[in-house]
Amino acid sequence: MTADQKWLAKVATVGLFVGIASVLSSQVAHADDPLAGSDTAIILGGTTEPTPSTAFAQAAENLFLNPLGFDGGATGSTVCDMIGTDPCAAPLQVLTTPELIQQGPSSLTAADDVVLAVQNEFNANPGAFSAEDPLTIFGYSQSATAESIAMSRLEADGIPSQDLHFVFIGDPSLADTGVWPNIVTDLDSVLGSSLTNTLLTDFGIDGVLGNVTPDDLYPTTIYSLDGDGVAQFQQDFESGGLLGDIEGLFVQHVEYLGLTPEEVANATTSTDDLITNVDISDNINNADAWLSAVFEHGAAGSGLIESVLQSLEFYLTNSF
């Protein structure tokens, strides 16, 4: 072997070791992520999004599950629609729930669906889920409330705490700041208790008032965008009154699926028992995020018309 050949061999050997070290380092980093061993996620939509589209489900994975290590850090995974509450064959499994404008009865019905869907996943795949390989359950807005309600029922059914991991965006039931723990007191201070009670009852919200995401039942990661008038209802109310909340409802609360991975990463993280809060900075292009969420990533294409019609049906007939 010539001197040049020996030199090239040494370079190749060093490169090989560097590559192996890089792979091992990457694997160790992933092993620390809460969803590193999870390869199945149940995906639910928010209000007026009863059946998340493929674009919705993949955006949820790319932006909010991928940073937690889901399915080895996968993006663009295949999507299937669950048959009722029965599992289907894809990493991202879409669960259809009502997601009506009347969030009280709608959330309670969706909570029943979540419980059945989780039970059916465990029954169909005995031994598939564990602390190392948890079943992931994703919720946005109203469905985060439904999943929060479902947690106590799942615990009562004997589903082990470490076998599930919930991931929420725009959680209305976020302790201290969310809309459901705070709206009654805040509206009372502006409108008086009589009018507040009438409005909340007429809009079908009374069934979820005071609901809080449990911090002691199942590991939960909650992403909140600064200014979100639902997840950060209390801060918006204190800084801008009801108009601040309304703006945050129709602007930041809509933008989650239109964020970029870099914007999601621009966040501060804190823990509260089993909850990990990821607070995302609003230092973004709001117009781009809003338009991308609505028209590219499924916010307007996940059953909007069906949900509105069902909401009208419920308003007229008290059933859906």
Regions found by a protein language model. Give the residues of each.
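Secretory targeting and sorting signals
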Residues: 1-31, 166
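Short secondary-structure transition/capping motifs
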Residues: 27, 103-107, 136-140
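Gly/Ala-rich beta-loop-alpha elbow adjacent to hydrolase catalytic centers
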Residues: 137-152
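Surface cap/lid and interfacial helix-loop subdomains adjacent to catalytic sites
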Residues: 33-130, 153-320
